[in-house]
């Protein structure tokens, strides 16, 4: 039975299940989902919301699931709809009902929000490293290529500025108005490497401006990369013949 299906009289159609399921593309969030859950379980134990032994059992179970996923031994299913329910279902199957306590003081709303931000923090860092490596190489064709150095440097600045708004913790906001449990959001922020906590729960779980801003930064960067690649194509043409592109990076 689906998490939300308590009042329904019959199972949803397979076509609806397939349409609603996001596991095909949010499976990539498994590391962030497990990291967020480990931090949340640690906080629940620390605050005495669940027994420390229960928290330890949940954390051990999550770490084992992470290892199995990376070893290719876990198969996600559409029946569980998304990465969050897949992992929680596997955890409960392995360690019993204590696994259900992981969701204490947490909603899927703030859970997916923290996963999304953790993932984009990682991706922003990877893009920055790539752009840094690219700008480091643009030093031999003098003034012309230095124009690209300036473009890519501004791209890095945009990603760095975008990261300031990504790097804020939504976990602890619950569905939209927090929780009555005595959670420690500052502890969670420190555990997950966020620089600050989002103060408004409704904003934290419902808004995706940070994702749109991230895509905007990617679009501007791709515009600059497109311009650079177009020049390489032009320079390699018969009319110019400035450069020769290696066969390994060419097509017929």
What are these regions (language model features)?
Residues 116, 123, 140-252:
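Charged, flexible cofactor/metal-binding loops and thiol motifs
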Residues 1-169, 178, 183-187, 251:
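A helix-coil-helix interface module used to build multimeric assemblies
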């Amino acid at each position: 039975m689906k998490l939300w299906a308590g009042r329904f009289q019959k199972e949803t159609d397979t076509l609806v299940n397939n349409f609603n399921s996001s596991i095909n593309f949010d499976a990539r969030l498994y590391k962030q989902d497990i990291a967020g859950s480990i931090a949340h379980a640690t906080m629940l134990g620390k605050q005495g919301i669940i027994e420390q032994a229960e928290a330890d059992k949940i954390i051990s179970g999550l770490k084992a699931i992470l290892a199995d996923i990376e070893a290719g031994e876990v198969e996600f299913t559409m029946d569980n709809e998304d990465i969050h329910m897949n992992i929680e279902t596997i955890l409960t199957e392995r360690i019993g009902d204590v696994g259900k306590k992981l969701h204490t003081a947490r909603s899927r709303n703030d859970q997916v929000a923290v996963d999304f931000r953790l993932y984009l923090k990682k991706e922003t860092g990877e893009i920055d490293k790539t752009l840094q490596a690219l700008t480091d190489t643009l030093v031999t064709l003098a003034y012309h290529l230095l124009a690209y150095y300036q473009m890519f440097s501004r791209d890095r600045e945009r990603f760095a500025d975008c990261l300031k708004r990504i790097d804020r913790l939504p976990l602890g906001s619950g569905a939209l108005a927090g929780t009555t449990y005595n959670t420690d959001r500052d502890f969670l922020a420190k555990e997950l490497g966020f620089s600050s906590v989002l103060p408004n729960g409704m904003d934290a779980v419902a808004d995706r401006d940070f994702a749109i801003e991230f895509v905007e930064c990617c679009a501007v960067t791709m515009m600059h990369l497109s311009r650079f690649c177009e020049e390489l194509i032009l320079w390699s043409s018969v009319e110019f013949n400035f450069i020769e592109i290696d066969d390994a990076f060419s097509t017929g």
